[in-house]
Protein backbone atom coordinates (compact mmCIF):
# COMPACT_ATOMS: atom_id res chain seq x y z
CA UNK A 1 0.00 0.00 0.00
CA UNK A 2 1.05 3.54 -0.65
CA UNK A 3 2.63 4.82 2.57
CA UNK A 4 1.97 8.47 1.71
CA UNK A 5 -1.78 8.30 2.28
CA UNK A 6 -3.55 9.15 5.54
CA UNK A 7 -5.60 5.92 5.36
CA UNK A 8 -5.70 2.86 3.05
CA UNK A 9 -8.96 4.16 1.56
CA UNK A 10 -7.05 7.24 0.39
CA UNK A 11 -4.28 5.19 -1.24
CA UNK A 12 -3.67 4.99 -4.98
CA UNK A 13 -4.29 1.25 -4.80
CA UNK A 14 -7.74 1.75 -3.27
CA UNK A 15 -8.56 4.25 -5.99
CA UNK A 16 -7.50 1.75 -8.66
CA UNK A 17 -9.76 -0.88 -7.08
CA UNK A 18 -12.71 1.51 -6.97
CA UNK A 19 -12.15 2.41 -10.64
CA UNK A 20 -12.35 -1.31 -11.49
CA UNK A 21 -15.78 -1.41 -9.83
CA UNK A 22 -16.95 1.20 -12.34
CA UNK A 23 -16.71 4.32 -10.20
CA UNK A 24 -15.08 7.55 -11.28
CA UNK A 25 -12.16 8.38 -8.99
CA UNK A 26 -10.94 11.95 -8.73
CA UNK A 27 -7.51 12.49 -7.22
CA UNK A 28 -6.45 15.85 -5.90
CA UNK A 29 -3.56 17.02 -3.76
CA UNK A 30 -4.05 15.29 -0.40
CA UNK A 31 -7.25 13.35 -1.13
CA UNK A 32 -9.23 11.25 -3.56
CA UNK A 33 -12.98 10.89 -3.84
CA UNK A 34 -15.34 8.67 -5.76
CA UNK A 35 -18.29 9.76 -7.87
CA UNK A 36 -21.41 7.57 -7.73
CA UNK A 37 -24.13 7.86 -10.38
CA UNK A 38 -27.72 8.08 -9.19
CA UNK A 39 -29.67 5.72 -11.45
CA UNK A 40 -32.12 7.22 -13.95
CA UNK A 41 -30.99 10.80 -13.21
CA UNK A 42 -28.23 13.10 -14.46
CA UNK A 43 -27.04 13.51 -10.85
CA UNK A 44 -24.25 11.98 -8.82
CA UNK A 45 -23.05 11.73 -5.23
CA UNK A 46 -19.45 12.33 -4.20
CA UNK A 47 -17.92 10.22 -1.44
CA UNK A 48 -14.77 11.20 0.45
CA UNK A 49 -13.90 8.54 3.05
CA UNK A 50 -11.06 8.67 5.57
CA UNK A 51 -9.66 11.97 4.37
CA UNK A 52 -7.72 14.51 6.41
CA UNK A 53 -9.74 17.21 8.17
CA UNK A 54 -11.06 19.43 5.37
CA UNK A 55 -9.34 22.78 4.95
CA UNK A 56 -10.85 25.90 3.41
CA UNK A 57 -8.91 25.22 0.18
CA UNK A 58 -10.09 21.61 0.12
CA UNK A 59 -13.74 22.67 0.53
CA UNK A 60 -13.39 25.15 -2.35
CA UNK A 61 -11.97 22.35 -4.52
CA UNK A 62 -14.74 19.94 -3.46
CA UNK A 63 -17.37 22.52 -4.40
CA UNK A 64 -15.77 22.92 -7.85
CA UNK A 65 -15.71 19.15 -8.32
CA UNK A 66 -19.29 18.86 -7.08
CA UNK A 67 -20.54 21.38 -9.64
CA UNK A 68 -18.57 19.83 -12.49
CA UNK A 69 -19.68 16.28 -11.63
CA UNK A 70 -23.34 17.25 -10.95
CA UNK A 71 -23.15 16.07 -7.34
CA UNK A 72 -26.24 16.68 -5.23
CA UNK A 73 -23.85 16.36 -2.26
CA UNK A 74 -20.44 15.06 -1.30
CA UNK A 75 -20.39 12.85 1.75
CA UNK A 76 -17.38 13.62 3.95
CA UNK A 77 -16.08 11.11 6.47
CA UNK A 78 -12.74 12.51 7.68
CA UNK A 79 -10.45 10.18 9.58
CA UNK A 80 -10.23 12.34 12.70
CA UNK A 81 -11.35 12.00 16.28
CA UNK A 82 -14.15 14.25 17.44
CA UNK A 83 -13.25 17.34 19.40
CA UNK A 84 -13.85 17.63 23.16
CA UNK A 85 -17.33 19.06 22.57
CA UNK A 86 -18.20 16.01 20.45
CA UNK A 87 -18.25 17.91 17.15
CA UNK A 88 -15.87 18.33 14.28
CA UNK A 89 -14.89 21.92 13.71
CA UNK A 90 -16.32 22.09 10.21
CA UNK A 91 -19.23 24.49 10.63
CA UNK A 92 -16.94 27.44 9.94
CA UNK A 93 -16.26 25.87 6.51
CA UNK A 94 -19.97 25.64 5.70
CA UNK A 95 -20.01 21.84 5.89
CA UNK A 96 -21.09 19.21 8.36
CA UNK A 97 -20.13 15.57 8.93
CA UNK A 98 -22.31 12.81 7.58
CA UNK A 99 -25.24 11.79 9.76
CA UNK A 100 -24.94 8.22 8.48
CA UNK A 101 -21.27 7.35 7.96
CA UNK A 102 -20.56 4.20 5.99
CA UNK A 103 -17.41 3.38 7.94
CA UNK A 104 -16.16 3.72 11.48
CA UNK A 105 -15.79 7.31 12.65
CA UNK A 106 -12.02 7.07 12.79
CA UNK A 107 -9.23 4.55 12.69
CA UNK A 108 -6.81 4.28 15.57
CA UNK A 109 -3.27 2.99 15.61
CA UNK A 110 -2.27 0.40 18.19
CA UNK A 111 1.24 0.81 19.60
CA UNK A 112 2.66 -2.71 19.36
CA UNK A 113 5.88 -1.74 21.12
CA UNK A 114 3.98 -1.91 24.43
CA UNK A 115 3.90 -5.12 26.44
CA UNK A 116 0.88 -7.39 26.17
CA UNK A 117 0.03 -6.54 29.78
CA UNK A 118 0.04 -2.78 29.07
CA UNK A 119 -2.03 -3.25 25.91
CA UNK A 120 -4.63 -5.26 27.81
CA UNK A 121 -4.76 -2.70 30.64
CA UNK A 122 -5.62 0.04 28.16
CA UNK A 123 -8.52 -1.93 26.65
CA UNK A 124 -12.17 -1.80 27.59
CA UNK A 125 -13.15 -4.59 30.05
CA UNK A 126 -15.50 -6.15 27.47
CA UNK A 127 -12.63 -6.35 24.98
CA UNK A 128 -10.46 -8.13 27.56
CA UNK A 129 -13.36 -10.48 28.29
CA UNK A 130 -13.80 -11.32 24.60
CA UNK A 131 -10.06 -12.00 24.26
CA UNK A 132 -10.23 -14.44 27.18
CA UNK A 133 -13.22 -16.21 25.60
CA UNK A 134 -11.30 -16.53 22.32
CA UNK A 135 -8.27 -17.93 24.18
CA UNK A 136 -10.52 -20.42 26.00
CA UNK A 137 -11.75 -21.67 22.61
CA UNK A 138 -8.19 -21.85 21.22
CA UNK A 139 -8.77 -19.15 18.62
CA UNK A 140 -5.54 -18.41 16.78
CA UNK A 141 -4.80 -15.22 14.89
CA UNK A 142 -2.47 -15.82 11.97
CA UNK A 143 -1.48 -13.86 8.90
CA UNK A 144 -2.17 -15.88 5.79
CA UNK A 145 -2.29 -14.12 2.43
CA UNK A 146 -2.76 -17.28 0.38
CA UNK A 147 -5.60 -17.76 -2.07
CA UNK A 148 -6.78 -20.70 0.06
CA UNK A 149 -7.08 -18.41 3.11
CA UNK A 150 -8.98 -15.89 1.01
CA UNK A 151 -11.48 -18.58 -0.02
CA UNK A 152 -11.95 -19.41 3.68
CA UNK A 153 -12.55 -15.70 4.34
CA UNK A 154 -15.26 -15.66 1.66
CA UNK A 155 -16.89 -18.74 3.19
CA UNK A 156 -16.85 -17.22 6.71
CA UNK A 157 -18.18 -13.90 5.43
CA UNK A 158 -21.08 -15.62 3.68
CA UNK A 159 -21.91 -17.72 6.76
CA UNK A 160 -21.69 -14.73 9.11
CA UNK A 161 -23.83 -12.41 7.01
CA UNK A 162 -26.48 -15.11 6.66
CA UNK A 163 -26.46 -15.98 10.37
CA UNK A 164 -26.34 -12.36 11.61
CA UNK A 165 -28.65 -11.06 8.86
CA UNK A 166 -26.55 -8.14 7.63
CA UNK A 167 -25.31 -6.92 4.27
CA UNK A 168 -21.83 -7.46 2.88
CA UNK A 169 -20.47 -6.82 -0.59
CA UNK A 170 -20.77 -9.58 -3.16
CA UNK A 171 -18.23 -12.33 -3.61
CA UNK A 172 -17.20 -10.74 -6.93
CA UNK A 173 -16.55 -7.41 -5.17
CA UNK A 174 -14.32 -9.12 -2.60
CA UNK A 175 -12.47 -11.07 -5.30
CA UNK A 176 -11.84 -7.91 -7.31
CA UNK A 177 -10.55 -6.18 -4.18
CA UNK A 178 -8.33 -9.15 -3.31
CA UNK A 179 -6.85 -9.37 -6.79
CA UNK A 180 -6.25 -5.61 -6.95
CA UNK A 181 -4.79 -5.08 -3.49
CA UNK A 182 -2.94 -8.28 -2.63
CA UNK A 183 0.82 -8.16 -2.76
CA UNK A 184 2.28 -9.99 -5.71
Could you tell me what each predicted segment is?
Residues 40-86, 92-103:
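Acyl-donor binding region in acyl/amide transferases
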Residues 1-42, 80-81, 92-103, 107-184:
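A conserved beta-strand-loop-helix scaffold within acyl/acetyltransferase catalytic domains
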Amino acid sequence: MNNNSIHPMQSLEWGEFRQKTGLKVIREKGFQLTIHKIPHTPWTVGYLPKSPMPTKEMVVKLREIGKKEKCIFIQLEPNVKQMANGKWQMANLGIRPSFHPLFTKYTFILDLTKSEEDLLKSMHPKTRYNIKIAQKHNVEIIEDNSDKAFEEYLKLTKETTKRQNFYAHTENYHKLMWNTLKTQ
